[in-house]
Structures are given as C-alpha cells and as structure tokens.
Amino acid sequence: MADHQASIPAQSSHQPEWQRSPRRGLQIIATLGLGAVVLAGCTQPDGGESAAGGTSSAVESSTAESSAAEQTEQLTFEKQQVAELDVEANPVPAAAAKLPEGFDLQSHRFGRGEWIESSREGLENSLEMGVSTLEFDIELSADGVPVVWHDTEIDAEKCQDTEPATNDDPKFPYVGKLVHELTFEQLSALNCNKNLDDFPDAAPQDDNRLLQLSEVFEIAADYPDVHFNIETKLEPEAREDTASPQEFVDAIMDEVEDADVADRTMIQSFDWASLPLVRERDAEIPLVLLWDETTWESGSAWIGDVDYDAVDGDIVEAAQQLGVQVLSPGHAVPYGQTPRDDDYHPVATPELISKAHKAGMAVVPWTVNDEDTMREQIAAGVDGFITDYPSTGQAVLKEK
C-alpha cells in the first residue's frame, strides 16, 4: 500500500453481503460539528489503548471495574448523506466502471497486522476470508523482476540473510542493500519473517521468501472476483535508488497482461509522474492517487506535472488533471490519529467525498486500522479503506 510514512478452495463468485452493501454515514468530530458521540472507548487492534476523547454518558467511577467497562464502550456514528458516485463524470468513465462493486475492503500488504507483511500466508488468508482487494507494493530487482515488497532497502528489522545465492557472491550479505541492486535469485535467499514491534500479533512464520508479482496472480487464480491494487514503489526524491518509472510500469503491466487481470487491476502511486505512463499503456485501467500531508504541497517532487498553486491545493482538481479514478489519502492529519484524539482531523470528510463522487471518483483512505476510525470513515461515506487488519474491517462492516 499505501503506507508512505503496509491449497485454498476456490472462492464463490458471490460477494459477501458486507461487500455488496456499502454503508454511508456521518463522521463525528466535535470540532467539525458533523456528528455526535453516543458512547466512548475501544481497544485498538494492536492492543494499545486509544487516547481518551469524546463524551461518556456514564457516571465516573474510581473502581477498576468501571474503568475497564469504559475502555470497552463503543463510539457510534450517524449516517451522512453524500453524493452518489457518478461514473460518467469521471475523466475516463470506462476505467471508473472497473472499480470493485460495493464497499472495497483492501488487505494492506496482505494484512500485515495479522500475518507477516507481503507473505504468502497473508495473501492466502486474505483471499480465503474474501477481501475485495489485495493491496501491495512492487519493487524492481536488478534483473527487472517485479517483487512484492514495500521497502527500497532490505531492512534488518524485517529480513535476515540465510546464505549467498552463489558461492563468493560479492553482494552478500544482502541485508542493507537496495532491492534494485539485487537479482531476484539473491532476494530469494532472504528470509523476511521477522515480527515487527508495531504488529506484535501477526502470526509468526519460520520462513517467508519474497514473492514476485506473477506468483500473486497464480495464487489468486481461483478467486475471480478479487481485485489487485498495485503500488509503484518509486522514490522521486532519490531516483537513483530504484528503477525508472517507465521500467516499473512496463514490468508491472507485462505481468498484468500475461495473467489477463487488467479488468481487476488498479495501479496506485505517490509518484504521480508514473500514472500517465500507465494510462499510455492501458487506456482503461483504473488509476489511484496516493497522498498525505507530506507529499501534497507546493513544490513537491511527488506530484509530477501538477501545479499545486495553480489548482489552489484542490486535490479533486489535481486528480481530474491526471485522469484518476480513486482518491486515496492518508486517513487523518496528523496521520494515525483516531476519533478518540482531540486533534483527529479526517481527510476523507463527507464534503470531500461528495465532491469526488460528483467528479466520478471513489475515495479509499489508508491505512485505517482501529475500529473507531473504521466506523467513522464508513459513516462519512468512503467507498472502501485500506487496512492492516482485514478481519477487523470485515467484522465492523457486518455491524448492521
């Protein structure tokens, strides 16, 4: 994903009920005056306690039992009516028509909060549970193989060396090297099975080898309804660290076409310069505009030919210029805040969603991990969200 600062039986072609029926609603945040808190308190999926916020109708108690009860109480959010998504208003209606139907639950890096990130196990479990979209990143190896991995550099916190791919390999050890410096054979010698402090509950694995894009399509072949949201993991502020945007687009699209999944594939990027290259390759593939407060600003290297000042910071106007189908913002400013925080300011507000829908664009924020934020964003009217916890997202979507 989208994180700028994450033998299976054949699947039925029938979509889960929660996926067929998107929920619309009203975000709550007292400072914005858009809704009301009914109850307060919830534990985040990573086990950490949420910051206190909102109003509780319960009388304060000093007992441990009352404190525990308050922590498990739930925020609720009233519906907000937003404009319907007008596909025909999109700059490329045929591309907008290919977006997933219903609410788009996207498994970020194959659900890295539940399984080791970008792992085969996470991929298979995400498919089996019935997510609508697999969200993942692509790096290019030295020999041009599109590799399913988020980081430009092999991080010792995630991966460990096993043995060199060849005797006396001068590149060994591989940890600490750029992905683009190593061949896929060398990358395959890495064991990227480490649990991260931020995701302590991810199921441990003895062995996790990096996947290539073609393997994702092979593993997902029995799931004809699943979509793929593929990020070109480019670094416009350090172009020398990766392959070129054109090389990324060509390598990814070659695999997409070989697997015959173009009708279920979206291409996303923070590096907006890569998106027109995708459109040149495929006139009808959906494009996803990624941004957060660090990339969408005047003079940013991330926004390609878009002039921030000329559009007066209007993200929808910028998206129209690029001909995209999905707006995908970091879910809040500051990023990571939740409705329990006093300074929670969601980016995907009902106002932005309505404006985007009138322009023919869906809104799918990242990375939405706690239940409160999931409920608030569903109520605000988002068309989906990207999450490290797809099981949590699925459970919240069933609350009707």
Feature annotation, model-predicted:
Residues 33-35:
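Classical Sec-dependent N-terminal signal peptides that target proteins to the secretory pathway
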Residues 2-8, 14-30, 42-60, 65-400:
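Phosphate-group recognition and catalysis centered on beta-loop-alpha active-site segments
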